[in-house]
Structure formats: C-alpha cells, structure tokens
Amino acid sequence: MKTKLILLYGGKSAEHEVSLQTAFSVINALDLEKFEAEPIYITNEGEWVQGPLLSGKLDFVEQLRFSATDRVKLATAESEKSEGEAISPAVLEADGQETVVFPLLHGPNGEDGTVQGLFEVLNIPYVGNGVLASSAAMDKIVMKKIFADAGIPQVPAVAVRLIDWKNYQEEMVTEMEEVLTYPVFVKPANLGSSVGISKATNKTELIEAMTEAFLYDRRVVVEQGVVAREIEMGVLGNDTPVCSVPGEILPEGAVAKFYDYKAKYQDNNTALIIPTEVEPEILEQMKEYAVQAFLGLDASGLVRADFFLTEDNQLFLNEVNTMPGFTPYSMYPLLWQETGLPYGALIERLVDLAKERHAAKNALKYKLED
C-alpha cells in the first residue's frame, strides 16, 4: 500500500512565498508510485484548504494557491464534504492508511514548534524536527545559549528586549558599543530567511536597524560582524546523524551586503560552491560542532548548520536551520546531492526517518504499570 503523504505548506508567516516554492519543488519530485500525495494549503489568513490528490507534476507555483473561488470539495471535521469550506486541522488524522505529514512551512507557525505540537497531539508521524528542536532553533537567543552550553564557538552578541529598548535606548546602545564593534547585524530573535535583518555600520544605522527588527519581534539579537567565509553543512538522521560535504555561499560583488532574503530566494547572483575546500582539521571540527548542535537541540530528520570561517581559521557556528530552503536549487538538497543522495531519494529518506522516530516514540511507556 502507498504511504499517504500530506504536504502542508503556505502559512501565516512572512515566509509564505518561500513555503510555496518549497512545496512546488517537493511535489514535482515525488514518486507517485510510492506515495499518495495530498496538498493542504494554509492561507495568509491561517485558513487550511485541502487540495485534490496529486496525479502528476505541476506547471506553476500558483496552482498551489487554492482560493475560495477554485477550491475543491473539502472534508471538514464536523460535516459532509461541501464546496468552499475550509478544513479543520483534524483532517491530518490518520484513517488507517500509513500516513506521514511533510510540513513544508518556514518561519513562525511553521518551523517554530507550533504546528509540530499539533502533529504530536494527533500522534501522527511528520517529517523534520520535533517541538523542542523547532522552537529552540527558531529563537536565536535560546539557540545561542544551547550552543554556549555545548562549548560551540559563536560570534559575540547582545540580546535586547523591546521594553528595555523603549525605556533605556541610550543605555542599550552604549552597552552594545562597549561589547561589539561595527559593523553589527541586527536580527529579530524569532524569524528566519534574513527577514527583518539589517547591517549597521554606525550608531544611526544601529538605531534604524533596531526599529526595523522590532517590527517583527519583541526580542532582538545584535551580533558582531566578522569578515569570514560562509560555509554550510547538512545534517541528516535521528539518533545517529551524519553530515554532508560542506558548501560555501559567495554573493556576487556588491549585489548584497550580506546574504539577505532577496539573495536567498529571488536573485540568481548568489553562487554556491559545493563541495568547497576546507582544511581537513577544520572540516572535522565543523562536523563535530554540527553534530553537537543537532544533538544538543534534540533534533531529528534534518538540520542545516551555518558557519563562519575567518582568514585565520577561527570557526564560529552562526545558526542552525531546522527547515532549510528545500527547492532542488537550495543549499541543503544540493549538499546532499553532492554527497551522493539525490533530491528524490532525500525526500524518501526524510519520510523514513519520520516513521522511525514516530515508532520509537510510540514504543515508550506513558503510564506506570498497575
């Protein structure tokens, strides 16, 4: 019997469009001889819309953007099938057929542990990281504390709350200028894909960057800028994760001052070198830190570890991403392709890992014996 694969994408997030691109790529790579694929679109307003079972490849991303006027018949939790109704998340519940959810969601409400909690409540297997790893890795401040506890080197950083910024802005700026030197990068604590991130080279730009970042979150992290190579590594597995070859990001000339949202998803000016050259001892250290971060977060399925490597071979772990860009041309799938695991096989491996983790969880005891 085929595995029913529910593809969940879209979402009430600034990264809605990224999720659509990811879903389009995964759907077109699926082996429909092995999977019964069902798309579920989450609109910008948070409405869940069930699409038809897939019978072939899609031609355009827009085919995944279901609306009130072109919706298929939808199964609601309370009623018979009816035209034009949004579904309840209860549609995710398994119906006797082996079912796995593949959440192709980015950003808040997608890779921050919230939707993962829903899957846990429904006791349904799902691809990727669980509640703990997803929520911790989505929060740059919490993530940094976990890395520090594991002894993983990071660039200096200062965390700032909105309430403190409003009440003590001048004192906050003074503290940052004492701890850090320009340039610095200002980031919302709880957002991905470089959304809301700015580079500041002086006090005026710092204040402007803080104002921008606080539009997206009430907590902000300010990081020391470093002149370094940006090297990324894929991690795959559950309890015994393995690492891919390393890849390097090379933004073209002055196209982007840093690897920003547009460079990641919209431009064709960002060069990826896979595999990239790294000294053997640095490569081994990189693998060690990537696995330490994976295990420290209690991650599962997939993680992309992003490093900085300076000219004098100082290695810093910048962040990990628990749902990295996942089109065939994104860094994570390309890393595994060059390691020997093509895109379609990578998807199937992730589904297998989801089943494996779910079986292990269900084998645990949840009550004392009488």
From Swiss-Prot:
Q: Which residues bind ATP?
A: 177-232
Chain residues that bind Mg(2+) 2: 319, 321
Q: Does the keyword Metal-binding apply?
A: yes
Might you name a Gene Ontology BP term for this protein?
A: cell wall organization
List the pathway annotation. Cell wall biogenesis; peptidoglycan biosynthesis
Catalyzes what?
Answer: 2 D-alanine + ATP = D-alanyl-D-alanine + ADP + phosphate + H(+)
Q: What EC numbers are recorded for this enzyme?
A: 6.3.2.4
Q: Which PANTHER family match?
A: D-ALANINE--D-ALANINE LIGASE, D-ALANINE--D-ALANINE LIGASE A
Q: Protein name, please?
A: D-alanine--D-alanine ligase
Q: Could you tell me the gene encoding this protein?
A: ddl
